[in-house]
A protein has these predicted regions:
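Metal-dependent amide/peptide-bond hydrolase catalytic core
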Residues: 207-385
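DPxDG-like acidic metal-binding loop motif
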Residues: 107-113
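Acidic/His- and Gly-rich active-site-bordering loop/insert found
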Residues: 1-98, 112, 119, 123-124
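Short Gly/Pro-enriched turn/cap motifs at secondary-structure boundaries
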Residues: 40-45, 136, 175-179, 321-325
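Histidine/acidic-residue-rich, glycine-tolerant segments that coordinate divalent metal ions
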Residues: 51, 73-74, 84-87, 91-98, ...
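Active-site nucleophile and cofactor-binding loops and adjacent substrate-binding regions
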Residues: 44, 97-104, 322-323
Length: 385
């Protein structure tokens, strides 16, 4: 494989939600302490953790791409004795860095696919690209790879996710039409603190601005054009019971069945935050931390995948579609390939998960990974012959 990484496969200006420089420096130092290759740390440090592996078989034939996301969640993994990773010694080494969404299995299957292709390459035509993407959580990483042109030559694009629910166990869904467009925002209100008993009238209460915003954000009218979502997941304010809060921070997200519906939610959000600030004589700032459009699917490609996977006989069901209702920045890859005349789909590998995604007890059935590698390898070789 030819391997490109870091700034070679990222448009650095298109990255979103980067940690602070101090956080990134600390992560690089930790990687070095744990034995990472210094050359790779240099190339991939400071928010450049992206990789594309390419194998070209011939000038004729399609360019086929598979994407695997790599990042963990800010979840503290369970130490319970009934949690298999804890019981068998492979629980997360670092706190608040748990693979609670299965992206470690996506990497594993991506590497398994790489080996599968390397051992089945005789007679293949065209080119395969294996895309390992950072920062799917918070939908922050895919756009930078797309803007770097990573999929501009791709004819067939495939994404996949493992897990979801018990009903999907040992199933392979060939498309997901349930992607919601989403935007992740941080809103900070700035006021003026004073003594809560001695001079409350001199205060500009940022906490009250935040409270006003939260209540009214949750009350945004729904859109007739389709599903919409609003969630304020974090609200931080205050330093003491007798001090009027001068800063309040909200971390929130909007979602919409279409990009247009999500845009409506964003505009209403901005109006409400501005109004809440004005009501309480505060200033405010809004920072975008992540965003993805609604994803599009090539139904004809999904039908073809269904006809390829069903004869394998390794899944109890191979449904055409599973609509999960979440958001995924793989949509950037799918949409770019379709916009440029190619075809794309996003598949779901069902697994009997032990707890919901993003839960401290999340775990998958590892046998499903093996079936996933076979499925991906079969799809790849079908289109590369």
């Amino acid at each position: 494989y030819d391997v490109a990484l870091g700034a070679e496969v990222l448009d650095l200006d298109s990255r979103m939600g980067l940690p602070s420089e101090d956080v990134m420096k600390a992560a690089m130092a930790r990687a070095m302490d744990e034995g990472a290759d210094p050359e790779l740390v240099e190339k991939m440090g400071y928010g450049k953790t992206a990789i594309v592996a390419t194998m070209k078989f011939s000038d004729d034939g399609p360019v086929v791409a598979f994407r695997a996301d790599m990042d963990s969640n800010d979840v503290i993994e369970s130490k319970a004795s009934n949690h298999t990773p804890a019981k068998n010694g492979f629980r997360s080494r670092h706190e608040k860095a748990m693979h609670a969404c299965g992206h470690d299995t996506h990497m594993t299957m991506g590497l398994g696919l790489a080996e599968y292709i390397a051992t089945h390459k005789d007679g293949l035509k065209g080119t395969i690209k294996l895309i390992f993407q950072p920062a799917e959580e918070g939908v922050r990483g895919a756009k930078a790879m797309v803007e770097a042109g990573v999929v501009d030559d791709v004819d067939l694009m495939f994404g996949m996710h493992i897990g979801f629910n018990e009903q999907l166990s040992n199933c392979f869904a060939c498309s997901d039409h349930g992607f919601l467009a989403t935007t992740k925002l941080d809103a900070v209100f700035h006021g003026y603190s004073s003594h809560a008993g001695g001079s409350p009238e001199k205060a500009q209460n940022a906490m009250l601005a935040g409270c006003t915003a939260v209540i009214n954000l949750q009350a945004i009218a729904r859109h007739s054009g389709g599903a919409s979502r609003m969630n304020v997941g974090v609200f931080e304010s205050g330093i003491g019971r007798n001090v009027t809060p001068d800063v309040a921070t909200l971390k929130l997200e909007t979602r919409g069945a279409t990009t247009e519906i999500n845009d409506y939610m964003i505009e209403r959000t901005k109006t409400i935050i501005k109004g809440a600030a004005e009501m309480h004589d505060c200033t405010f700032e809004i920072t975008k931390q992540g965003e993805t459009p609604a994803g599009r699917i090539s139904d004809d490609l999904a039908r073809e995948v269904q006809s390829i996977i069903e004869p394998l006989g390794i899944f109890k069901e191979v449904p055409f579609d599973y609509s999960g209702g979440g958001s995924e920045d793989c949509a950037y890859f799918l949409n770019r390939v379709i916009d440029r005349g190619g075809r794309a789909t996003y598949m779901v590998l069902g697994s009997a998960i032990k707890a919901p995604h993003h839960n401290p007890l999340f775990d998958i059935d590892e046998e499903d990974m093996l079936n996933g590698i076979v499925a991906l390898g079969t799809i790849a070789t079908h289109y590369l012959k």
